[in-house]
């Protein structure tokens, strides 16, 4: 799997990390990431998916309601959030690869309240993998890698490779959170 450490330490941008990568590389990284997410769920039980973890660092600055800003995310919430973000990155990358301008967002997030079982979130990850690989397959044979956009102020410009990689970086940023939630759930189950 790709090392996002230089991005987190602000030593490199997504576009820097994307230099020299191919569409096939992105497909391989996507398979690896989804396999890591599914592996994290191997010992999870349905009750773990809806357990509200202790998360003193919870701070969702994009929450639609003020009371949700400090909400600790359940495992189900994390999975539907991260898959939606990666799918959005894949969709925007497809737009860029086709030589078109990105206008607005391309995001749909399954309501996290629907994520109540391990089977549901496993399916969500598998479905997301299929969707992202399909979007990569839809790239032209010669993608327009000179087509750049800036997602928002303060971010360096990126092309299709950088935009797609951004979704994987986002997935990576939530892997540890998934493991922490599952570990908290395991400890709670053992104590019950």
Give short role names for the model-derived ranges.
Residues 1-76, 80-192:
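Aromatic-glycine hotspot motif
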């Amino acid at each position: 799997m790709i090392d996002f450490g230089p991005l987190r330490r602000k030593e490199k941008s997504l576009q820097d990390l994307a230099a020299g990568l191919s569409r096939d590389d992105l497909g391989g990284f996507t398979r690896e990431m989804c396999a890591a997410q599914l592996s994290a769920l191997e010992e999870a039980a349905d009750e773990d998916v809806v357990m509200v973890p202790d998360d003193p660092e919870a701070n969702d600055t994009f929450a639609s309601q003020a009371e949700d800003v400090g909400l600790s995310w359940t495992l189900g919430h994390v999975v539907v959030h991260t898959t939606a973000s990666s799918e959005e990155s894949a969709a925007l990358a497809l737009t860029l690869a086709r030589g078109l301008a990105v206008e607005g967002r391309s995001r749909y997030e399954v309501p996290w309240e629907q994520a109540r079982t391990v089977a549901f979130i496993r399916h969500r990850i598998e479905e997301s993998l299929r969707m992202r690989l399909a979007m990569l397959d839809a790239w032209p044979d010669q993608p327009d890698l000179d087509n750049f956009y800036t997602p928002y102020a303060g971010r360096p410009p990126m092309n299709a490779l950088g935009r797609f990689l951004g979704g994987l970086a986002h997935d990576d940023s939530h892997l540890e959170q998934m493991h922490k939630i599952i570990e908290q759930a395991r400890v709670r189950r053992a104590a019950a």
